[in-house]
């Protein structure tokens, strides 16, 4: 068309540049629209990816993944998914052989209300599973503290000791500035934390510079002062902190705030639950043996030997 229009070379160059700019702008708009459309899916995939990355394992054994939206996991009126997960946990715990029982339940994102969290907490407590989930994605630590206080999520009920709640969302990827995206993609930190918990010795909390560092994470939603970290830890949250050039968890609290200090620390709760399940499994295997003084001594001896082998220094 330009050649047939008898235009000069300079006019043709200018026209080509205008068309190229228009096409480039249209491409950027369409790419940005595509990014916005798949954002929730991208969040989900990146969240699962960070769980795997933080296990530091080439292959993970004994894992089950449920494809469910947050709406399905918080709907108490139509509790199909909640019941299905509860049945799966119960089927592997309410039995004689406990080798296939679950120990971690990861629910990335904010469950939204105290009644929903209590529903999940009771399921976890009944099956001796530790839940890792998240608080709301907010922009400032003061907002987190205020909203958490108003939500009344922590409490003295024993089942609250089976829930850990992280805050300060992770930067899953930086924003695409060339496309006009204005904000980084933030993802819930509970999956990355649970991945680190998966690889760490059960009695050791996954927190601090040495044990709490998150792999392949560059940043967090907001920076935290030492006083703010202390306040978040005090109210029962697990804040993600960027210091020393890395992102780390800086608390080991559960949502339990009763008098029993042990139940406020998730490593203690997990060890208690594990020891209970080991002893239950052991005694199930010794059921209906003839009972005499020799059998009693043998049983007591094996239990004492096991408990001695796992005691601290």
Residue ranges of each PLM-predicted region?
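A short, well-structured beta->alpha microelement
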Residues: 67-94
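Charged, low-complexity intrinsically disordered boundary/linker segments
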Residues: 43, 62-71
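Short linear motifs in intrinsically disordered/low-complexity regions
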Residues: 2, 57, 68, 76-78, ...
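Structured, hydrophobic secondary-structure cores that serve as assembly/anchoring elements
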Residues: 3-43, 47-50, 56, 91-313
């Amino acid at each position: 068309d330009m050649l047939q229009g008898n235009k000069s070379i300079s006019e043709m160059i200018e026209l080509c540049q205008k068309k190229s700019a228009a096409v480039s702008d249209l491409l950027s708009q369409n790419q940005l629209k595509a990014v916005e459309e798949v954002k929730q899916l991208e969040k989900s995939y990146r969240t699962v990816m960070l769980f795997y990355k933080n296990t530091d394992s080439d292959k993970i054994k004994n894992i089950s993944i449920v494809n469910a939206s947050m709406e399905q996991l918080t709907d108490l009126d139509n509790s199909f998914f909640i019941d299905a997960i509860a049945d799966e946990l119960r089927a592997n715990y309410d039995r004689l052989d406990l080798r296939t029982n679950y120990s971690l339940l990861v629910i990335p994102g904010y469950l939204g209300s105290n009644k929903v969290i209590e529903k999940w907490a009771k399921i976890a407590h009944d099956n001796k599973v530790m839940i890792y989930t998240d608080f709301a994605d907010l922009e400032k630590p003061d907002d987190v503290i205020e909203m958490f206080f108003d939500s009344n999520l922590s409490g003295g009920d024993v089942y609250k000791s089976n829930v850990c709640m992280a805050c300060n969302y992770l930067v899953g990827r930086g924003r695409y500035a060339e496309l006009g995206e204005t904000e980084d993609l933030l993802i819930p930190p509970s999956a990355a934390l649970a991945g680190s918990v998966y690889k760490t010795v059960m009695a050791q909390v996954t927190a601090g510079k040495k044990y709490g560092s998150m792999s392949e994470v560059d940043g967090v939603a907001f920076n935290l002062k030492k006083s703010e970290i202390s306040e978040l830890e005090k109210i029962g949250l697990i804040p993600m902190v960027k210091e020393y050039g890395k992102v780390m968890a800086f608390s080991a609290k559960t949502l339990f705030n009763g008098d029993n200090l042990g139940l406020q620390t998730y490593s203690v709760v997990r060890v208690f639950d594990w020891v209970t399940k080991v002893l239950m499994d052991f005694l199930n295997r010794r059921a209906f043996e003839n009972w005499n003084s020799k059998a009693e001594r043998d049983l007591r001896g094996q239990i004492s030997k096991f408990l001695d082998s796992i005691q601290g220094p």
